Amino acid sequence: MPKSSPLRLGVNIDHIATVRNARGGRHPDPVRAALTAIEAGADGITAHLREDRRHIRDNDMERLKAEISKPLNFEMAATPDMVRIALGVKPHAVCLVPERREELTTEGGLDVVGQRDSLAPSIARFNDAGIRVSLFIAADPAQIEMAAKLKAPAIELHTGAWCDAITDDEPAKVAEEWRRIVAGAALAQSAGLEVHAGHGLDYATAETIAALPQIVELNIGFYMIGEALFVGLGETVKAMRSAMDRGRARVIAA
């Protein structure tokens, strides 16, 4: 059994900004949400500055970096403009993701194999700047191995297909996707990569995946913002932290 590391919770506050932007103005404030999440136990804050600025804005990233006490994870497409902005903000970490304007949310993992020549310079620039790079990828061996070759310190495994299969009550696909995640986490750790996971996670799936000892960080947003409408963001963060701790305890007890 691989030794377990502490499991961090990164709270994605994008959809606080989605609500704000529905009417314009400054409320609800994503930075206030980030501070609330941290007070409730979040280990870091994730925000995605999309090229179309549909939720998070440039000023949000600058304020988050200046005002929060925990690490900022800057999600972004690996475009020259976004690389320039991120280097200016100097977050603790960046997560490179695929991005299409017509999508409602990030729909798949980054094609590191196909885009290795364009990704390599960006990864190198962030490494040189002391900004931790993670690549948001499917649990595919070729993608994981290429991430290691490009000297990305970390990957974030895309858990969306697994979570969708659970929602759609497709047990065979659930089992298949879970096997891919388990194998991918083990391969990534053996390749020297720090392993994160995210997309579509809720209390139950976060508790399940927390039992994988290789995974050291979960980034969760949409579900938590939805739950916060009913019980408040602070209570939602505490409940998610508890779910993760229950899952992690199964590793410790094993």
Swiss-Prot record:
GO terms for molecular function: pyridoxine 5'-phosphate synthase activity. 1-deoxy-D-xylulose 5-phosphate binds at residues 14-15, 50, 55, 105. It holds the Pfam family PdxJ. 3-amino-2-oxopropyl phosphate binds at residues 12, 23, 200, 221-222. Its EC number is 2.6.99.2. It catalyses: 3-amino-2-oxopropyl phosphate + 1-deoxy-D-xylulose 5-phosphate = pyridoxine 5'-phosphate + phosphate + 2 H2O + H(+). The active site is at residues 48, 75, 199. CDD domains: PNPsynthase. Gene3D superfamilies: Aldolase class I (3.20.20.70). The record marks 156 as: Transition state stabilizer. Keywords: Cytoplasm, Pyridoxine biosynthesis, Transferase. GO terms for biological process: pyridoxine biosynthetic process. It is found in: Cytoplasm. SUPFAM superfamilies: Pyridoxine 5'-phosphate synthase. It is an enzyme of class 2 (transferase). GO terms for cellular component: cytosol. Pathway: Cofactor biosynthesis; pyridoxine 5'-phosphate biosynthesis; pyridoxine 5'-phosphate from D-erythrose 4-phosphate: step 5/5. Signal peptide: none annotated. Transmembrane segments: none annotated. Belongs to the PNP synthase family. Catalyzes the complicated ring closure reaction between the two acyclic compounds 1-deoxy-D-xylulose-5-phosphate (DXP) and 3-amino-2-oxopropyl phosphate (1-amino-acetone-3-phosphate or AAP) to form pyridoxine 5'-phosphate (PNP) and inorganic phosphate. Homooctamer; tetramer of dimers. PANTHER family: PYRIDOXINE 5'-PHOSPHATE SYNTHASE. This is Pyridoxine 5'-phosphate synthase. The gene is pdxJ.
